[in-house]
Amino acid sequence: MDDLKIYRWSGACGLAAIAVFVIEFPFYMVRTGFSGVTDPAGLADYTVRNGTNIMTCVFLDLVIVTLMVVFAAGLRHLIRQADPQQEWLGTVFFGVGLVYVTITLVADSLQAATVVDALTVPADPTIIRTMTESMFLMYGSVALFLMAVMMAVASYATTAGRALPTWSGWLGYACAVACLAFVPSMFVGRPDIKRFYNPAGWGPEAIASGFPLAAWMIAVGVLMIRKGRRVAQSPAAA
C-alpha cells in the first residue's frame, strides 16, 4: 500500500472512530437508576435494566478501538516518512496507543461481565461491585494519562518532523494538558458518578476521557486525508 492510501485510510479511520463515539455517547446519558456501588441490590438491578445499553456500548467500543489502531499505525507511518529521525517517537506513540486500547478492552470486558453476572440467577452483587469499581480508573485516570502521553508525543513528533502544521501540535499539547488535569481525580474522595471531580466523576469519566482526544483526532484525521491528496498530486506520486 502506497503512502497516499495509508494517509487517506488512516485519516478516514480516525474520523470514523469519532463518528462512532458521537453515536455511542448518548447511550451513557440515558442509563437510569444508578444508586451507587454501596447498594448491592440496587447495583444488580441497575445492571439488569441497562444490560442492552451496556452491551451496545461495549460493541461500539470494539469498533472504535479497531479504527483507532489503524489511525495510530498510519500516523506512525506519516511521522517516519516525514523525518526518519522521529521514527522512535512514532513507535513510542504507537506503543502507548496499543496500551490504551488494551486497557479499554479490559475495562469493556469487565463491564460486559457485570451484565452477564446480573443476568445469571442468582446474581452476585459483590462480584458486580468489584468489577464495577475495577473499571473506574481504567476509564478514568489511567486512560487519561495514556491519552495525554499519546497526544503529547505525537504532537512533538509531527511538528519536529514537519509532518503536520505547527498548530496541530499546539492543539495536541492543549488536549494533553486537559487530560492531565483530570488524572489527580483518582485521589479525590470516594467514587460518585453524580459529582464532577472524583475517581468515577462525570468530569474524568465522561468529558475528559472523550472530548480532548476526539478534538485532536478530528484535526489530525482531516490533515492526514489532505496530506494524502497532496501526495497524489506531487510529481513523485504521478
What are these regions (language model features)?
Residues M1-A238:
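Hydrophobic, aromatic-enriched alpha-helical segments typical of multi-pass transmembrane helices
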